[in-house]
Swiss-Prot record:
Extracellular topological segments: 1-27, 85-102, 156-160, 233-249, 322-333, 379
Record protein name field: Ammonium transporter 3
GO molecular function, one term: ammonium channel activity
UniProt topological domain (Cytoplasmic) ranges: 49-63, 126-134, 182-211, 271-300, 355-357, 401-431
Amino acid sequence: MEQFSTSSSESSDSSSEYSLEFYMDTSWVLDAANLVFFMQAGFGMLEAGMVRAKNTKSILLKNLINTAICAISYYCVGHSFAYGKVNPNSFVGFGNFFLMDYTHYAYWMIQWAYAATATTIATGAMAERLQLHCYILFTLVQTILIYPFVAHWIWSQNGWLFDLGIVDFAGGAVIHIVAGITGACGSFLLGPRIGRFNQESGKPKNLPGHSVVLMSLGAMILWYSWYGYTAGASLGMTRSRVLPASRVSVVVTLSGATGLITVLGIGKIFNGHYDLVKGINGLIAGLVSSTSSCAYIEPWAAIIIGFIGGIVYWFSSWALLNWLRLDDPVDSTAIHLFGGCWSLISVAFFATHGRVRNPDIILPGGIFYGGGISLLWVQLVGMVLAILWAGFLSGIFFFTMDYFGKLRVDVDTELAGLDNSNHGGSAYIFD
C-alpha cells in the first residue's frame, strides 16, 4: 500500500492540507474505506446463509462484535504497531497510540476496515461451535498482535519485507493469508462439527447452509465492495494514481468473473451440475487471487489469474475436507489462505516492468516480462513468514483456550443451536 504511492494520505505533509489534490485524495480514501467497511455486511449475509438456521443469530452477532472490538483495539494499539511513526523499526511500528499526534484519519479508517475484514474472514472458519468469549479474545489477539505486525513488515515504508521489495498491493498476504491461516488453526483445534463426518467410514457428510438467497446477496455485496477494497489501496485519484486505480477495477472484475465461471465448470464436470454455492466461493476466490497484483498487471493476465485461482480453490477445498478433515463451514481457508498465496505468487509472474512500487523505486517485472526470479523469492519469503507468524500466534491462542476448556461449546449447545442456547431464540419466527 505505502509501496504504491509516496504521496499517500499517511505521508502527506501539512503544507498540502488545503490543496485540491489533498481534498480529492482524502475523499477517495474515505469513500473506499466505506466500501471496505460495507464488506462486513457482505460477509455477514454470506456466512449467515452458509450456516444452518439454528446458528444465524450467532454468526451475525459474531461479525458485529468483531467489527466493534476491532475498532477500539485498532484505535488504541493496532494502528500504532502497524504504522506508528515514533521510533519505528523494521519489525514493528511504535507511537501514536490512541491516535495521539496523528491526523491522517482517512488513512486510519481504511486501515481499520482492512483489519476488521481480516478478523471477520478468520472467524467464519470456526462457525457453529466456537464459544462467544473466544471470538472476543481472538479479535483482540488478531488486531493487536497478529495483523499489525504483518501489515508493518509489508505495507509500512519502515518494514523489512518492504525493504526487500515485496509486492502486495491490496493485501493478498496482509489480509487473506493472515485471515486464512488463523481461521484454519482455529478450525483445526476446534475439530469438525457434530455430524460432519460419517462415524463408520470417516467420509464427509453434507451439512448445507440454510439460505442460498443470503449467500447470493452476500456475494454480490462483496463483489461490489471489492472495488473500494482494491482500488482504494491506491490512496488517491490524482496525478499518476488515476489510471492504476481504474485498471485495478477492470482487473478485479475479470479475475472474479473468471473464478466464478471456472468453478462452475469444474462442478459441472465432476458433479454433473452447476453448484451455486461453489460458484459463489469461486467468485470470491477469483477476487482474492488478484488482490496482490491488481495494480501491476494487464487485464488479460487477470483472466489467467482468476482461472488458476478457481482451480486452486476447488482442489484445496476438496483436499482440506477429505485429507485433513478440516471442517470449514464457509470454505474461508481454501478461498483466502490458498487464494492469498496464489495472489502473492502471481505477482512474480505477471507484473509488468515499471509498475511495481512507485516511480522512485523501480523493481524488475515478473518472470513473463524478463524480470527473473528475484521477485518470486521475495514473494515466497513474505508468504512463508506471514503464515508462520499468524499461524504460530493463533495456534498458541487456540491451544490455550482449548486447554482450559474455553474453546468449543458443549455438545448439547451445539446440537440445539447457538441461537436457542445462547442468544434468546431462533432468528426466524413463524406464526
